C-alpha cells in the first residue's frame, strides 16, 4: 500500500459524528451568509429537501442545534467575537472563519455537555480543514480569550433559567 502524504489538510483520523455535525453547521452558516438568507430558514429548507430527496443526507440533530443556536444568538455571538478581535473587524474575516468562530462561541456559551477544550480544538481542526494557513492559530487565539469568560456566561445563563425560590413565610 502506498504511503499517503502527511499534508495538513488530509487527516485520515476517523471523524466523529459531532465533528461532522459541526462541519455541516459551518457549511450551512457560510452558505446562509453568502446567500444573504436567515440560517434557520436555510436549515428548514435543507431538512425539507432531505425528506424529499433520498440522495440528500438528513441533518444531524447536533447540526440543527448549532445552526438554530447561532441564529438565535447571532448578535450576542458576533459581539463577543468582535470584542476579542485586535485590529480587525468581523466583516474583514474570511467568511468561513466567521462561521467557525460562531459555532465555537455558541458551544462555549451554551453547550454544557461540551468541554471548552473540545469546542476550541474542534474549531481549530475545522479551520485547518476549511480555511487559510493562518486561520487555525487565529481561531485558537480568539477562542483562547473567549474561553476565559465562558464559565461566567454559562453561570449567568443558568441563573436566569433556574426557577426562583419563593421565600417561606
Curated annotation (Swiss-Prot):
SUPFAM superfamilies under this entry? NusB-like
Cited InterPro entries = NusB-like_sf, NusB_fam, NusB_RsmB_TIM44
Against NCBIfam families, the record matches this protein to:
nusB (TIGR01951)
Please report which protein family the annotation says this sequence is part of: Belongs to the NusB family.
One GO term of the cellular component aspect?
Answer: cytosol
Q: Name one GO biological process term.
A: transcription antitermination
**Mind listing the UniProt keywords for this protein, alphabetically?**
RNA-binding, Transcription, Transcription antitermination, Transcription regulation
GO MF, any single term: RNA binding
- Which PANTHER family did the record assign? ANTITERMINATION NUSB DOMAIN-CONTAINING PROTEIN, N UTILIZATION SUBSTANCE PROTEIN B-RELATED
Q: What is this protein called?
A: Transcription antitermination protein NusB
This chain's function reads: Involved in transcription antitermination. Required for transcription of ribosomal RNA (rRNA) genes. Binds specifically to the boxA antiterminator sequence of the ribosomal RNA (rrn) operons.
Amino acid at each position: 500500500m502506498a504511503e499517503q502524504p502527511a499534508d495538513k489538510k488530509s487527516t485520515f483520523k476517523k471523524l466523529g459524528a459531532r465533528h461532522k455535525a459541526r462541519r455541516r453547521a459551518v457549511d450551512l452558516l457560510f452558505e446562509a451568509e453568502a446567500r444573504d438568507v436567515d440560517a434557520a430558514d436555510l436549515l428548514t429548507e435543507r431538512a425539507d429537501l432531505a425528506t424529499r430527496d433520498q440522495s440528500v443526507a438528513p441533518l444531524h440533530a447536533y447540526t440543527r442545534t448549532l445552526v438554530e443556536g447561532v441564529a438565535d444568538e447571532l448578535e450576542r455571538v458576533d459581539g463577543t467575537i468582535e470584542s476579542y478581535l485586535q485590529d480587525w473587524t468581523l466583516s474583514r474575516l474570511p467568511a468561513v472563519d466567521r462561521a467557525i468562530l460562531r459555532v465555537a462561541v455558541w458551544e462555549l456559551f451554551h453547550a454544557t455537555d461540551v468541554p471548552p477544550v473540545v469546542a476550541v480544538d474542534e474549531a481549530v481542526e475545522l479551520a485547518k480543514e476549511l480555511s487559510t494557513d493562518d486561520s487555525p492559530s487565529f481561531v485558537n487565539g480568539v477562542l483562547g480569550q473567549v474561553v476565559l469568560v465562558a464559565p461566567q456566561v454559562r453561570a449567568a445563563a443558568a441563573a436566569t433559567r433556574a426557577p426562583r425560590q419563593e421565600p417561606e413565610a
